[in-house]
Amino acid sequence: MRSVIASLAAAAAAIFLAAPVATSQTKTVEPEDNGKALVNPGMGWMLYYYSNVLDNYGSKLAPEDTVEEFPGVGTVFLRLPWAFLEPQKGKFNWDIIDTPAQRWIQAGKQIAFCISGTENWTRQGTPQWVFDEGAKCYEVNGFLEADYDDPIYLAAVEHLVEAMAERYDGDPAVSFFAIGLYGMWGEGHTVLTTPVHGKSWGFDTQKKYIDIYTKHFKKTQLCISDDFPGHDNRRARFEITDYARSKGVTIKDDSILVQPWPNSWFHAGMAQLFWPAMPVILEHEHFGSSVDRGAWDKELLLKAVEDYHASLLSIHWWPREELEANRDIIERINRRIGYRINMKEVTYPETIRKNESFHITAKWKNEGVAPCYGGGYPCYTIKNKKGGIVAVLVDTGLNVKDLGVDAPGEGFPVTSDTEFTVARAETNSFGTFARVCPTGKFDIFVSVGNAYGTPTIALPYDGDDGHKRYKLGSITITE
């Protein structure tokens, strides 16, 4: 870090995270972004463990392998046919999703789901028992597609969604749930099937699926595919996406770099309705397939992240192969994807007295492309040399979700000037009372987390204490 005051003597005594130089009363520190990938809730790279086909792309990984060397992986995505999850009515094969899910959960990552109703690589995405009960379907080139308006199909869909919501809704380990039981591959389109059987569905049908999912998922983020209104229509606003937005449902663009430029994507304009309020999710084409057809372009992948203000981006291939071929652009994307909360400067007193107010002034900036939707509050934690917590000072006047989003190198930080008191005393007719608080010289750390001081968001600094707190320097507490 750089010292704000050019004092070589002070710099020599500086700690590893910051190079503060004391005035007679305060220290000012400018933390330096270490450039590393961050693993934080609701952002980063998504590893596709199942991409419809169960072998793609987690089947080559050992049971303990979470591909930790791929920087910025925060989520594992499980997209698979309904027929594999509920092969018999009401009898669920939870093992198929919970086994890989727990591998990443215990590594501190999140999970995301898409259960599909129609597939063209296997006989059917929908379980046979649904059709045996009388749900109408169409046969297309050997596979089955349900009539998405059929009341028997819709009832079975709702029972499945209800069962999944009971298990997963509101779990902080779940990043999002895709509305996948309408359309091919869970992508909300029938472009491959309607020309064959002649049946098409529109807004009224699509709305039913949004309503079913939002009825049961009250807390977890839901998304629809950008293909709901048409896979290659470049308009920004559609009736179905406006409706989804009104219900708190975001979009997932499933078609990045499927075709070469200028058709590398179609719906960046659509994303502008969503990203200010909820995360936008991107899926690039299967990496190998994109390369084979000449559509893969590293710079365009970064541009898509910028244009869509994307929070999450797929690893849609064998993860280590994609990493080796794209390490340079992955590192650059990691500096921008989602949110990247930076404290640009902080000034705090060298010495404070118990039961006496003081101020900490800090400048904060989000240097990612998307808001920190879950939010969080800055916290200053004072610890002794053994790591014991002496004081916790939360700045609830600044929520990082309110920090603006700017182009690289643009915009200005937000300043927060907050008054704190350590070991405040209260006096009444019975006497004066205050919590026990030691005096002496301590370390002061910064973090971002919940309103009572638990860190939840990784910051781009060295000097982590193991709990997402980052050392700024020292502070003395006196009587």
Regions found by a protein language model. Name each.
Residues N334-E479:
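Extracellular/luminal regions of secreted and cell-surface proteins that mediate adhesion/ECM remodeling
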Residues T26-I152, Q272-A325:
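N-terminal substrate-binding region of glycoside hydrolase catalytic domains
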Residues S7-A18:
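Bacterial N-terminal signal peptides
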Residues L17-T28:
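Bacterial Sec-dependent signal peptides at the C-terminal "C-region" and cleavage site
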